[in-house]
Amino acid sequence: MNANPEFASFARLVESLTPWLDQVVIIGGWAHRLHRLHPLAHPLQYEPLATLDADVALPRRIRVAGDEIYKRLAANGFEAEFLGHHRPPAAHYRLTDPGIPFYAEFLTPLVGGAVGRRGKQNATQRVGGVSSQNLRYIEVL
């Protein structure tokens, strides 16, 4: 494994998500970084996109047997930082270790309109014990 501390932080996230690895997809900057590690990937002469977060695509419903996702995240040193006014609020799941700015965000497909019939925004939902942001086109992953 790479000695880069960012990879160690990412590994803690993956460890937390182990029971659901068949149901989740790593997207965004970390997907590009991981692709470079594949034996068939072409070596590139520039550094990969660096982000402080890992984006995790979740299905709208996830099978949970045993601990929920948040409990496993907390056991691996992550803590929820709630943002915004939505219900549930959007969240960054940050590592609590000093000096490590790494965090995870969860994203779920937006089904229907961004605003419901009664005027309530459909921006977030609770999935498997974590707050997930609803976004268009996540389902194509």
List each model region and its residues.
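Compositionally biased terminal segments of proteins
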Residues: 1-141
